[in-house]
Design a protein with these regions (language model features):
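Single, function-defining residue in the core of a domain
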Residues: 1-15, 104, 108, 139-141, ...
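Gly/serine-rich nucleotide phosphate-binding loop at the start of the catalytic core
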Residues: 1-70
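Structural motif
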Residues: 19-27, 119-125, 319-329
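Short, amphipathic alpha-helical segments that act as regulatory/interfacial helices
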Residues: 29-33, 129, 331-339
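Short secondary-structure transition/capping motifs
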Residues: 35-36, 48, 66-70, 117, ...
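Generic structural signal for well-ordered secondary structure
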Residues: 39-40, 52-56, 71-74, 90, ...
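A generic secondary-structure signal
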Residues: 49, 80-84, 166-174
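Active-site-proximal, Lys/Arg-enriched surface segment
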Residues: 63-139, 149-151, 249
Length: 341
């Protein structure tokens, strides 16, 4: 592969960022060019393949020693996205909260440990990041993240829920993302404190229920999967798909009275997985089709995780310094965003 002789044109908006000095901007452009176009996304690989890098040491110092604020950089990234119609957020958009585990091999990397990887269905050695992600009909990009670091004296679930609440506070109080609806997976939707935190800002939410979640029906509490065996579903069209649907306003454990929707996709394809979905939302009066369509947007964060790991170096940082690793992940989000402009 021939060396990359110039910074990618998508890095030009960095010239207007106030969080970086002139020389820091050059390093950032080099690093972003490497994340986007180099085969190896480490400092060593970028220095070898991107000629403006000067040296691996210079990039390492940029990540670990130079004085710049990655949080300010991130806010400037989000401000830049609002300058373009195709990436400007709106009330009709959605904020997705989810986490991702990046498998690693080193034992001295920041926050590395054993985490359950939902995409693999097993516990792996790696780093765990909790993300907020914006999406709507025209665009999709990350908003911010927190790294979860496992400690023996802490409850893993509660600590990760706390990080998610911190993210929501930042988005609502500092950034001001106008999206009216939050989307969760079953793990995050299990935390009543997180749900209440979203509702405290007057926002809506949609998330799946675990099959063992307790629902009050006929004056008794039963599992939602047991409820599914009792009820009669009605066949309805949602876009180009057919679902068998049942929905009612019901008390759910930890969530209070919410709209419960049980949906089973109808298909003639024997190879297509056809699980029953148990969804809940505080959008009590929302049509079933709206709830199903809304929740389908959650998949876009999975695409971001996949693209970031395969093509943009999400899991390639070898820096052992915590601040340096955080800066790498912020620059990776910036790379993803600039490539969409």
């Amino acid at each position: 592969m021939l060396p990359i002789t110039n910074h990618l044109s998508c890095t030009e908006p960095l010239d207007e960022f106030e969080s970086l000095s002139y020389h820091q901007t050059l390093h950032a452009k080099t690093y972003i060019t490497g994340l986007a176009a180099a085969r190896s996304k480490t400092c060593k690989g970028i220095a070898r393949e991107v000629l403006p890098a000067n040296s691996e040491r210079a990039l390492n110092k940029f990540l670990t020693e130079y004085d710049w604020d990655e949080k300010q950089l991130n806010h400037e990234r989000l401000e830049e996205l609002q300058n373009h119609g195709e990436t400007r957020w709106s009330q009709d958009g959605y904020i997705i909260i989810d986490d991702s585990v990046t498998q690693r091999t080193g034992e001295e990397l920041p926050g590395v440990g054993r985490f359950y990887d939902h995409s693999e269905g097993e516990t792996v050695w790696g780093q765990n990041l909790v993300y907020a992600f914006y999406t709507d009909d025209k665009t999709a990009y990350p908003l911010t993240f927190r790294q979860y670091e496992k400690r023996d004296d802490e409850d893993e679930d509660e600590t990760k829920y706390k990080l998610a609440r911190e993210i929501i506070t930042e988005l609502e109080d500092e950034v001001g993302v106008p999206a009216d609806t939050y989307l969760f997976d079953a793990w995050f939707a299990h935390d009543s404190g997180l749900i209440k935190h979203v509702e405290s800002y007057g926002k809506d939410w949609v998330g799946p229920l675990r099959s063992n979640r307790q629902v009050t029906y006929d004056n008794e509490e039963i599992r939602v999967d047991a409820l599914e065996e009792r009820i009669d579903k009605t066949e309805r069209e949602v876009d180009d798909d057919t679902y068998k649907i049942w929905t009612q306003k019901r008390p759910v454990s930890k969530l209070g009275e919410v709209k419960v929707l049980i949906a089973e996709k109808v298909t003639d394809d024997e190879d297509e997985e056809n699980p029953v979905k148990y969804l809940a939302t505080n959008k009590i009066d929302a049509p079933s089709a709206h709830v199903i369509r809304t929740y389908s947007y959650r998949w876009r964060i999975e695409t971001f995780f996949e693209d970031s790991k395969q093509d943009l170096g999400l899991g390639d940082c070898e820096v052992r310094d915590g601040e340096g690793a955080s800066r790498h992940w912020h620059l990776q989000m910036l790379t993803y965003s600039l490539l969409r402009l």
